[in-house]
Swiss-Prot record:
Gene Ontology cellular component annotations, sorted alphabetically: membrane
Membrane topology classification: Single-pass membrane protein
Protein name as it appears in the record: Uncharacterized protein DDB_G0284005
Top-level taxon of the source organism: Eukaryota
Membrane-spanning segments: 13-33
Taxonomy of the source species: Eukaryota, Amoebozoa, Evosea, Eumycetozoa, Dictyostelia
Species per Swiss-Prot/TrEMBL record: Dictyostelium discoideum
UniProt keyword Transmembrane helix present: yes
Keywords annotated in UniProt: Membrane, Transmembrane, Transmembrane helix
UniProt main location, coarse: membrane
Subcellular location: Membrane
């Protein structure tokens, strides 16, 4: 009797289990990297929003690069150099 002929096809079960496990690991890795990419895009959008909010006459936003390579915003209060007009129309009065 040949040594490869068995009553139960164990090889098919091993192949099916290996395929299921490898597909599961691949799905977990792909979902992890997609989530990481989306978080990075959201961080970039958040930094753009912070940059828009921070540029006021009383704050100087200085972008620096932290250890992970992303831009961070540091707000440093500065003294206003001249008195700002109270509203838009007061600067137009001659």
């Amino acid at each position: 009797m040949d040594e490869y002929t068995n009553d139960f096809p164990w090889m098919y079960i091993v192949i099916c289990l290996t395929t299921i496990i490898s597909v599961t690991i691949f799905y977990i890795l792909v979902s992890f990297f997609i989530k990481r990419y989306r978080n990075r895009k959201n961080e970039e959008l958040g930094h753009a929003l912070i940059t828009k909010i921070v540029y006021t006459p009383h704050y100087n936003s200085q972008p620096i690069i932290n250890g992970s390579g992303h831009y961070s915003i540091i707000n440093q209060p500065i003294q206003p150099q001249q008195q700002q007009p109270q509203n838009y129309y007061s600067s137009m009065i001659v």
